[in-house]
Amino acid sequence: MTDQLESFSLEVDAWIEEHCPESMRTPMPVSEQVWASSDINFPTTDSKTWFDAMVSKGWCTPEWPVEYGGGGLSFEESKILRSRLKFFGCRPAQINFGISMLGPVILEFGTDDQKKEFLPKISRGEIWWCQGFSEPGAGSDLANISTSAQLKGREYFINGSKIWTSEANKADWMYCLVRTAKTEKKQAGISFILINLRQPNIDIKPIKLLSGQSPFCQVFFDDVLAKESHRIAAENDGWKVAKRLLEFERTMMADLGSEGAVDVEPIKTYKNSKAIDAPGQLKLHKKIIKHEMRNHLIDLTMARTGIESKVGFSPAALILKYISTEETQTRWELNVTSLGAGGLEIVEKSQGPKQEIAKSFFYSKAYTIAGGSSEVQLNIISKHILGLPS
């Protein structure tokens, strides 16, 4: 590390000590997440203090240009910042799909006006974004979408339906794939459009799951309007934008568990637990050590992928999504095993580390489906990276 970067690291440490409340340096339960929104909700005073400090510094989007609400940091400085935030156990100041997925494609493909209109609001957490990709007839075969957008004057009239849209009933805007032309090659007639969800003719229906929760929705469009100026890239050229966004999504999915919801390292659960008998301890301990080593290798690969993605497509993003989500499931399985017979106990309205481990264990089963199932990822890897025949 250069003297300049060493000095920056010390500055970051001092800033965190001054601006990050102690309560924001503890594992974060789902109930205390701060979601970006036009009507943002802060569960505690400290969460608002931490949010305001990070936004003011531009460190929610550390590598974005300052004029767009970012911190203007170099890649190396940003890496140090993330490392020090993780070292102190700092909670993410906000949960924001705009930062992790949409913002990077606007930076890459958007016009100057689009960057000025959306990026500062994304960085400040003023918009809750949802993703309108999947449809009842287009899941893994995403290019099969049929939701149409017809340009009349300076506005698109959108008709159709999106499904499995996370938190659409809470979102302000949707970034959406629509069909703007019927072509022989399905990918050639797709456009990428930003849609304001706070308008008439949109019907959003939450989908109730077995758990009783409804994080997913189906969204119906009936002559819904979107400005032509809110189309990212040229008409019928949205597939390249979608592919790039999916790279960022897969990188985000690969990083699941390292920030956001409560993250509990299996080695800590193991050390604090008396539930495993002596014969089983050695075998479990070996599994945990192997898991920790794999996670370290994943972190190193993610750092390399971050550099590669600056200049274009990085095949490691596809591989990381598969490996990391599988490893995330392993993490929670090891946590549950360390707790013994009571590891999966869930008591209604009860809180605490044990509860969070059980909930995270169950939810982790979705990681290998969300953002593209593991089976689909393996197909893509075999065809497009390894060059194997279909």
Description of each model-found segment:
Residues 154-155, 159-205:
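A short core secondary-structure module
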Residues 1-96, 117-124, 254, 265-274, ...:
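Amphipathic, small/basic residue-rich leader segments at the start of a protein or domain
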Residues 3, 202-298, 367:
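Glycine-rich beta->alpha junctions and the first turn(s) of the following alpha-helix
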Residues 28-31, 275-279, 295-350:
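C-terminal helix-coil-helix/basic helical segment that borders enzyme active sites and/or dimer interfaces
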Residues 94-113, 139:
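N-terminal glycine-rich flavin-associated loop
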Residues 147-150:
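A structural signal for short hydrophobic beta-strand segments in well-ordered beta-sheet cores
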Residues 125-133, 177:
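A short, Trp-centered hydrophobic/proline-enriched beta-strand micro-motif
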Residues 80-81, 101, 239-248, 253-259, ...:
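Glycine-rich phosphate/cofactor-binding loops in nucleotide/flavin-utilizing enzymes
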